[in-house]
């Protein structure tokens, strides 16, 4: 079968076959109007930290502009624990993010270590900066020191830092790193040793950009950007419109991912896992950025404008307002461009903590390359804004929190007849991309 025939077959199998179901919660503080049977939903795993390598706490210079994100207990839906499908009927499938695994992935060589991380209690990958620690805490400490970041605690500076909650407060996590013996000078000495090796081995963000070109990331964004000049106000229920837009965008999301540098070089099973883990945040980031031009609402890929008042009437006003204030408004305020959006979405895509991932180390390295390329881009493109890179990263915890909250409202059933989402993603990834 040639490429065009393969695409036609795939499109025919998908047309009219995507059905969605969902349950919308009521206003905050009230039980949802409809309780779906979620006994057989697949479950997102725990929301412990390390998801982006830093937590939702803000730097002191921006602490007044960021809003608290709910902790793991607040964001976890009680009905979304690991299920066992009933034998009487096919299980309903929730496209919930696979999320971080109970034990974040480490390089295979470290799996047999008997040490645990002194900071969060996770499995240690070795001794880093004087202390046995995991890759997540090691990376967090290194970034904090190298970028000379300053954090603020929203509570009383004694937050619990463990494997599940290490990402909740950056301030307390950093202080625990210091109290357990991590040495700032060890990070600085490490960087100096690298520089002394010579120009060919100097750590370089421009080198990272060569391997993770932002130009290619921008091309991926532009390739799937809906070409819509005018938007019309939605007439139907906003939830229905959002579901239909998500339905449509799930297909383009796969094509977007295949254009991100090195994604298709990963094992096919890992590609499925990464898309399944991040689909909701990736879609939310996309329509939030598209909505920068909207007034008091969001713009969907289907060409519809969903107004804030409609969302409140439908009972989803609280989460809708969070999207507008924590994502859309912040993106508008800093004039986030599409290259920056693409890089943030690539950070979400390359999630080394996704459950079941085999190429953990490779995915971690790809995420680090995206960070480095984004930092280099912001320094070059916006030299008058030295804090822009950090400001961009502060949108990630909000995106994560909102993504989890949305899953408490929207439950998507199986797609394409009886095929589960993993099968759908596998077919999309195996199918050659259409030529452009």
Curated annotation (Swiss-Prot):
Q: How does it sit in the membrane?
A: Peripheral membrane protein
Residue ranges of domain NR LBD in the record = 209-432
Q: Does the keyword Heme apply?
A: no
Where does the protein principally reside?
A: cytoplasm
**Which segments cross the bilayer?**
none
Claim: ATP-binding is one of the keywords in the record: no
- Where do the segments described as Modulating lie? 1-116
Q: Where are the zinc fingers (NR C4-type)?
A: 117-137, 153-172
Cite the InterPro entries for this sequence.
NHR-like_dom_sf, Nucl_hrmn_rcpt_lig-bd, Nuclear_hormone_rcpt_NR2, Nuclear_hrmn_rcpt, Retinoid-X_rcpt/HNF4, Znf_hrmn_rcpt, Znf_NHR/GATA
Record remark on domains: Composed of three domains: a modulating N-terminal domain, a DNA-binding domain and a C-terminal ligand-binding domain.
By what name is this protein known? Retinoic acid receptor RXR
